[in-house]
Swiss-Prot record:
The gene is N. This is Nucleoprotein. Residues 219-331 form the CoV N CTD domain. Homooligomer. Both monomeric and oligomeric forms interact with RNA. Interacts with protein M. Interacts with NSP3; this interaction serves to tether the genome to the newly translated replicase-transcriptase complex at a very early stage of infection. InterPro entries: N_prot_C_CoV, N_prot_N_CoV, NCAP_gCoV, Nucleocap_CoV, Nucleocapsid_C, Nucleocapsid_N.
């Protein structure tokens, strides 16, 4: 006779609606799921994980002698039209004597099983930790105090007792629904410390997103946040974010070319290498506070020294000559190129350097009105542009981890 109990014995962890919550209790449960969240391979057909440390997830409820178990491979699939498609494997941790391989002794060879043990663990003993009932307990966030898996694996950062938002990067905040007896013994971190960890994790994840696009909403937020925290999004002019360029006072850096191109101008990237970080500005500046009718004004005076033997010293000097009080000027070897797309504003200058829509006949030049115009797109200009962007010797220059300063705690 078929029994309904048979459906409960499955190798796959039951679906989890809420993540996070209390530490695994010392008494086991009737479920068959891992207490911990999974580690996930980054590629299909990856080799079993190797660990920098013991490979046993942190669990303060257990003695050192009980810190041993195994990681078990779980094949994963996602539904596609007409069937399913394999995705990189997940690996779940179980204590020795529990879970799908409960009948194995520590060290027994079996495909898809990796045995791990902490230093001083009694691997001959079997655990009474049990497995997790997903209807009663949430997955516990992974922590490895002595080192986690190798670089071929990842896992979502879940702060303890934090709420989820979107895809799994935070734990459920359903702690208030837990039994009071567990609430009192849980959570040794303060709320502010958890906030800091969550923010740090988000920063790391954001920095690891290669090739991520900046949406219009994000760009608008970058350009209109508090003035001292603004950054120039792609496609924005300098004066759209920081106001018109001036001479002899604040906002005096940038010539017309830099203003038009924004962060596309290679000189911006070069000069950001010399701009102090937030901490350097605060603790390395001469800070002058002044009360004004509109509020408190803070003035930061900071000096960056570029040694004369710096390989790019001459380029820095050249950029400063061009851009300090540079409003209304352009580099001598630069000519505004004809716009490839229509402009909503008609040209007002009578000495326009190039006729409209002159793609096929490049040799046709405007009448001799400005000798500098004829020098556009020469090899000299290309050489100068290459120098300004410092593409020749990237190993000489350290552009810093975050030149735009977006991800600062």
């Amino acid at each position: 006779m078929a029994s309904g109990k048979a459906t409960g014995k499955t190798d796959a962890p039951a679906p989890v609606i809420k993540l996070g919550g209390p530490k695994p209790p010392k008494v086991g449960s009737s479920g068959n799921a891992s207490w911990f969240q999974a580690i996930k391979a980054k590629k299909l057909n990856s080799h079993p994980p190797k660990f920098e440390g013991s490979g046993v997830p942190d669990n303060e409820n257990l003695k050192t002698s009980q810190q041993h178990g195994y990681w078990r491979r779980q094949a994963r699939f996602k539904p596609v039209k007409g069937g399913r498609k394999p995705v990189p494997d997940a690996w779940y941790f179980y204590y020795t004597g529990t879970g799908p391989a409960a009948d194995l002794n520590w060290g027994d060879s079996q495909d898809g099983i990796v045995w791990v043990a902490a230093k001083g663990a009694d691997v001959k003993s079997r655990s009474h930790q049990g497995t997790r009932d997903p209807d009663k307990f949430d997955q516990y966030p992974l922590r490895f105090s002595d080192g986690g898996p190798d670089g071929n694996f990842r896992w979502d950062f879940i702060p303890l007792n934090r709420g989820r938002s979107g895809r799994s990067t935070a734990a459920s905040s359903a702690a208030s629904s837990r039994a009071p007896s567990r609430d009192g013994s849980r959570g040794r971190r303060s709320g502010s410390e958890d906030d800091l960890i969550a923010r740090a994790a988000k920063i790391i994840q954001d920095q690891q997103k290669k090739g991520s696009r900046i949406t219009k909403v994000k760009a608008d937020e970058m350009a209109h946040r508090r003035y001292c925290k603004r950054t120039i999004p792609p496609g924005y002019k300098v004066d759209q974010v920081f106001g018109p360029r001036t001479k002899g006072k604040e906002g005096n850096f940038g010539d017309d070319k830099m203003n038009e191109e924004g962060i596309k101008d290679g000189r911006v990237t070069a000069m950001l290498n010399l701009v102090p970080s937030s901490h350097a500005c605060l603790f390395g500046s001469r800070v002058t506070p002044k009360l004004q009718p509109d509020g408190l004004h803070l003035k930061f005076e900071f000096t960056t020294v570029v040694p004369r033997d710096d390989p790019q010293f001459d380029n820095y000097v050249k950029i400063c000559d061009q851009c300090v009080d540079g409003v209304g000027t352009r580099p001598k070897d630069d000519e505004p190129r004809p716009k490839s797309r229509s402009s909503s504003r008609p040209a007002t200058r009578t000495s326009s350097p190039a006729p409209r829509q002159q793609r096929p006949k490049k040799e046709k030049k405007p009448k001799k009105q400005d000798d500098e115009v004829d020098k556009a797109l020469t090899s000299n200009e290309e050489r100068n542009n290459a120098q300004l962007e410092f593409d020749e010797e990237p190993k000489v220059i350290n552009w810093g981890d975050s030149a735009l300063g977006e991800n600062e705690l």
